[in-house]
């Protein structure tokens, strides 16, 4: 019998194939854009989901399921998360003969046996597919699997070496060679996570290091190494290791001074003190189409939108403008951190910043991640159940802390970015 395919059936097949194709990797860069395997632009509008604290398990699971957290993100239109981890997690795996520790151990070591046991019970209740023997990386895998189901992209970010709150000039994690920032372990950790996460289809990018900064309590290290020449040297080492472990990964490079500017990486200027000039050939086999830059801004007390726009452009977004004569290398540039208090006087003070970013980021068509999708942390800066005033979620993660911000500023920012 001869079969005929109706137009409606054919259309249905096409739609089904398109849906099944998400996220349609591998990804690459093309000029100022990240593109998928069909050369379609991939723009990211998302939130930071921290997993780099003392427990080294992504936050909030004592209050919500993984599905619930990601559904809330997706529910307001976001399509991405910046998922953070600490190098110490990988160090512990190597110290344990290559085996990750289970979340029972992680919570007890991070919170103490009594509180760790209590919090773990809540995590298991909200996430019944887990057991006490589930490992930390299996939690990350579950997040990645749910991201795939909900079509949420992942930027995997090495946030800090030592599992704890970040960041400060005296925390030992500032710069390569600081007391807690072992370069060889950092390279090893990036490669390990790249190899592990290459099985996550939703992973688009991998960030090498969050907020390189001046070691303010280590003058010897600062004077010897805190400069663009060394940042470039170390970023090449980290990028090579990640690329070797996962050749499909787009690699995200950050800048100096808490990653507030990356200008020397795209301007063609000579980096101090040794005079290097950024060269894609220094990233052999991937420099042409696997590199992205990232910047941060926390100028949330400013009263001038033109000033904020000027700083963002000249410290990073300029690299997306191929017609700018001061741009030697065109890159996609992501704003991977920005944020402010979600209510009270500090929120009111940040209104210029908030409204300016809500307009400027869509205008620039820049990918971005707000800081931060939390309510209470497992622990932060020695305080268990720390309630972050900057967190987007209510203390118990039950809803948004400031619906007016979400509706008036964030949703239009999301929609405009992803248009």
Indicate residue ranges for each PLM-predicted region:
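Extracellular glycoside hydrolase catalytic/binding regions
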Residues: 177-178, 184-205, 209-367, 375, ...
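Aromatic- and acidic-residue-enriched carbohydrate-binding clefts of CAZyme catalytic domains
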Residues: 95-136, 166-180
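Aromatic-lined carbohydrate-binding surfaces of glycoside hydrolases
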Residues: 85-92, 144, 149, 153-173
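Soluble non-cytosolic domains of exported or imported proteins
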Residues: 60-64, 130, 134, 138, ...
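Short, solvent-exposed turn/loop segments enriched in Gly/Ser/Thr/Pro and often Arg
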Residues: 84-89, 159-165, 209, 257, ...
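N-terminal carbohydrate-binding accessory modules
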Residues: 16-82, 93-116
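Fungal secretory targeting signals
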Residues: 1-20
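Aromatic- and carboxylate-lined catalytic core of secreted/periplasmic carbohydrate-active enzymes
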Residues: 300, 400-419
């Amino acid at each position: 019998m001869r079969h005929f395919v109706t137009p409606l059936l054919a259309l249905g097949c096409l739609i089904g194939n398109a849906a099944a194709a998400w996220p349609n990797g591998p990804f690459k860069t093309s000029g100022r854009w990240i593109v998928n395997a069909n050369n379609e632009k991939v723009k990211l509008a998302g939130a930071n989901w921290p997993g780099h604290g003392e427990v080294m398990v992504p936050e909030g699971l004592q209050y919500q399921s993984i599905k619930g957290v990601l559904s809330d993100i997706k529910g307001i239109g976001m399509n991405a998360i910046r998922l953070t981890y600490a190098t110490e997690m990988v160090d512990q795996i190597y110290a344990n003969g290559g085996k990750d520790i289970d979340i029972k151990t992680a919570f007890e070591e991070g919170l103490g046996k009594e509180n760790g046991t209590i919090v773990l019970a809540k995590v298991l209740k909200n996430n019944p597919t887990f057991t006490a023997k589930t490992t930390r990386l299996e939690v990350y895998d579950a997040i990645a699997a749910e991201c795939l189901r909900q079509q949420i992209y992942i930027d995997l970010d090495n946030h800090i070496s030592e599992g704890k709150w970040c960041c400060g000039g005296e925390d030992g994690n500032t710069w390569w060679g600081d007391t807690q920032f072992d370069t060889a372990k950092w390279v090893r950790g990036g490669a390990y996570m790249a190899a592990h996460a290459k099985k996550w289809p939703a992973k688009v990018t991998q960030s090498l290091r969050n907020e390189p900064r001046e070691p303010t309590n280590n003058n010897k290290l600062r004077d010897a190494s805190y400069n663009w020449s060394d940042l470039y040297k170390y970023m090449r080492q980290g990028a090579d290791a990640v690329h070797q472990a996962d050749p499909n990964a787009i690699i995200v490079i950050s800048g100096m001074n808490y990653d507030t500017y990356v200008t020397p990486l795209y301007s063609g200027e000579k980096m101090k003190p040794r005079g290097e000039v950024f060269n894609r050939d220094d990233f052999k086999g991937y420099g042409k189409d696997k590199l992205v830059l990232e910047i941060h801004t926390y100028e949330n007390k400013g009263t001038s939108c033109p000033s904020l726009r000027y700083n963002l452009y000249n410290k990073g977004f300029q690299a997306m403008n191929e017609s700018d004569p001061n741009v030697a290398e065109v890159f996609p540039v992501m704003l991977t951190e920005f944020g402010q208090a979600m209510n009270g006087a500090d929120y009111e003070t940040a209104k210029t910043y908030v409204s300016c970013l809500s307009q400027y980021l869509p205008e620039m068509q820049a990918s971005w991640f707000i800081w931060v999708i939390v309510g209470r942390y497992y622990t932060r800066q020695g305080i268990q159940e720390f309630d972050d005033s900057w967190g987007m979620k209510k203390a118990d993660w039950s809803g948004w802390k400031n619906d007016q911000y979400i509706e008036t500023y964030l949703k239009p920012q999301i929609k405009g970015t992803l248009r």
